[in-house]
């Protein structure tokens, strides 16, 4: 294992990733931009902690972001996403591309950390200094993606990873958030879902750029492919030149992986040729700024108001139902 790569299989809060046991708060932007995994892992940890050193480090590296291709992978629990990702990493490495992974898990109700689960299957890549894997908890964003996920992706981008994969468990409405982060979104399904696939949200079908039927050696895989293709054709956007492919894979045997990566890379090329790659980056950055403004403004408003008599009166009136939440929010925005 390279000296810069420090990986723990299970720290006290349940994470896996590089730099987890490093408690130093010193951030070295130069090392991060050189791809130092310990320095990068440290910055991600500090950003998770909302530490001033982390924010300062992020500011120092931001101008070096916007180059990585971001691939989002989502799907129901048990669909073999982590095994699929492990083989996708290997295929990208065969093509001499550096790969970063942010694996998003639901937060543990006891520790707030990320569940290890099948992520240990990715450990085969931990001795490769061209791969960086970070498992992160959603911290209250069940099935969705927290602010620190976005920050971690940008850190890996600045570190020089050609591809950054976001893997998230596909549960709840927030699973569509992955399209806000990723240039290309791969939706993973498996045979045997039966009528459940019919209830798949239209929004999820709309965000998918590539559809994968994993565990295709099971009975019903051809039916699953046909069903997905039919649903996609019915919901096809006429002006969209990209036609999402539906591919079969057997991840545990490594079958169909090269074809999947080919399809993903074809979508990347489509985005580059159409100008949508840069447009996505602009939109994603604006969404990030908007979320920060909302967060910072709310913090500032409540910090300024919390000790005032007017704020206590407002809380009392709200509790007694003398005013409604909308009116209370309007008063806070106006400075009470």
Residue ranges and their predicted role:
Residues 3-4, 11:
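Low-acidity, Ser/Thr- and Arg-rich intrinsically disordered low-complexity segments
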Residues 24-71, 79, 88-174, 178-196:
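Nucleotide-state-sensitive switch-loop elements of NTP-binding domains
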Residues 52, 97, 190, 209, ...:
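Non-catalytic alpha-helical coupling and interface elements of nucleotide-dependent molecular machines
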Residues 76:
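P-loop (Walker A) phosphate-binding loop of NTP-binding proteins
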Residues 84:
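Hydrophobic positions on the alpha1 helix immediately C-terminal to the Walker A/P-loop
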Residues 172-182, 189-239:
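Conserved C-terminal guanine-recognition region of P-loop GTPase G domains, centered on the G4
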Residues 216-270:
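Canonical P-loop GTPase G-domain recognition
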Residues 248, 259-336:
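Long, well-ordered amphipathic alpha-helical subdomains in the mid-to-C-terminal portions
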